[in-house]
């Protein structure tokens, strides 16, 4: 019995040696793998973010996302605040900033230094300060939907998410938050008017015939359609530095043969103009603003030889009110 017990010892010793050898081999392989990994080029955080963004965007159709276009002039502080706010909006694919500060470098380096950012922001330096610069066919535009926002307007994320869902149901119309109307007179001259929500019980509410593009969604195909308009339309906008939004309503109404836009009642939309340090005020403050826009309406009627704008009283709200029946001006 003692002899048999002694005979089993060499086998156990051999097993221990094999185990030790295996551990040594595994350790060497791990060290080699670590060394090879160290030799590989490092992947920066911003590159990884870009890669994840590309993979994410590839999984979405062009109807599931939109591009924000924002034209700006002399409001860098406010611009950075707005860009930071809109970064968190779901379904936002890209931001295009139309930089109208001629002779001044766009703040792309400053913006990038505050990153990384989940949504890419592209600054488009312009050679002339024109109102219609924002209506170019940008090669970076890859989505069907455009969200156009003025550089002093902050729209809440819930409002944008809801309005985008409405636009997906009506992709041939402007879907936005600021309605306006044209008013005809007995002399046949048109004037530009605001939109007043009326008190309940006073009818189905006021009517609008335009939805301003400075806080709206619309189809990117209309940017190309705008470029094909008569030269007189472009000249009117350049001469007045105004009315590109009125022209877009004319163009779309004429193209689709119905009301150009759908009014979505905003819950939380603010004008931040007073928060900028530049001291620059929007053109709507000018005394001649309303007269100039009335002039544009009549001029466009002459150019197109018709009045394509049509009235609507439909208001779509997150809270289910079907008509514009609240007494206040928008």
UniProtKB/Swiss-Prot annotation:
Residues that bind UDP-N-acetyl-alpha-D-glucosamine: 71, 75, 100, 129, 134, 150-152, 244-245, 293
Disulfide bonds: 243-296
Keyword Cell division: no
Glycosylation sites per record: 74
Tissue specificity note: Ubiquitous.
Active site: 245
Topology in the lipid bilayer: Single-pass type II membrane protein
Cofactor(s) required, per the database record: Mn(2+)
Gene Ontology molecular functions: alpha-1,4-N-acetylgalactosaminyltransferase activity; glucuronyl-galactosyl-proteoglycan 4-alpha-N-acetylglucosaminyltransferase activity; glucuronylgalactosylproteoglycan 4-beta-N-acetylgalactosaminyltransferase activity; glycosaminoglycan binding; manganese ion binding
Similarity-based family: Belongs to the glycosyltransferase 47 family.
Protein name, per record: Exostosin-like 2
Source organism of the structure: Homo sapiens
Gene name as annotated: EXTL2
